[in-house]
Swiss-Prot record:
A GO molecular function held by the record: methylenetetrahydrofolate dehydrogenase (NADP+) activity
Family to which this protein belongs: Belongs to the tetrahydrofolate dehydrogenase/cyclohydrolase family.
Protein name: Bifunctional protein FolD
Catalytic activity field: (6R)-5,10-methylene-5,6,7,8-tetrahydrofolate + NADP(+) = (6R)-5,10-methenyltetrahydrofolate + NADPH; (6R)-5,10-methenyltetrahydrofolate + H2O = (6R)-10-formyltetrahydrofolate + H(+)
Highest taxon of source: Bacteria
Annotated source species: Wigglesworthia glossinidia brevipalpis
Keyword annotations of the record: Amino-acid biosynthesis, Histidine biosynthesis, Hydrolase, Methionine biosynthesis, Multifunctional enzyme, NADP, One-carbon metabolism, Oxidoreductase, Purine biosynthesis
Binding site for NADP(+): 166-168, 232
Any single Gene Ontology cellular-component annotation: cytosol
Amino acid sequence: MIAKVINGKNIAKKIISKINLKIKKYSKLGMRPASLAMINVGNNPASKIYISNKEKICKKIGLISYLYNFSKNISEIDLINLIIKLNKNNLIDGILVQLPLPKEINKLNVLEKIIPKKDVDGFHPYNIGRLCQRKPTIVPCTPKGIIRLLKYYKINLLGLNAVVVGASNIVGRPMSLELLLEGCTVTITHRFTINLKKYIENAELLIVAIGKAEFIPGSWIKPGAIVIDVGINRLKSGKIVGDVNYEDAIEKASYITPVPGGIGPMTIAMLIENTMQIYINNY
């Protein structure tokens, strides 16, 4: 069996194109353009790439982006004061803080200061709480993008045994909540999980987000499983790989996402979609 490759890059392009048409329509109606404020702290190379990719897409489709770059020495209070200022600016629709932040800054304290209706990443406790209560408003971008991909390929999630590897607040935890909403039976594993292999071997849907290059061998994959690889890792050779051994897993899975070109583009597409959702709600 050779898995069908889920092309997130192409699907993300289609989503962005539809949003572009909406932006042009709103412009003809005399509406102001949507806007996104992005805050980056420090010189993390990966963060710079993510920010640059977001800026390029915003510029391409006519969505205004504002980038606030700070050194790693910025104080937490200065960062919070900027967020409070952006909260009050009616010309700013969405606000995001690029993660990770320096360890000296309390991440939750900062994210909580973004008002929920401008929380484009969906990380505010209010928005996560809505997701827990089955009444989502703004959904975190990566889990939202994964569900969108699965639905695009008409994969029936109802009743599937889903295993999420990684329990981060960004992907693993909200992903498990999204899967519950879709009717999956969900197991979430983490660094304290004993015998991880046992769980993965029983997964009909496997979602991996741990940031460890090719950590999951193909031999662990259940034949016919759907494999979603969120990881993005650079090997010493310079090659970009995911958290799953792609070359082996593709021979056992029924569907699989590549790295790069799988989940990454969809995450950005969902960020743009969330921004437009906030724009329409708040206009």
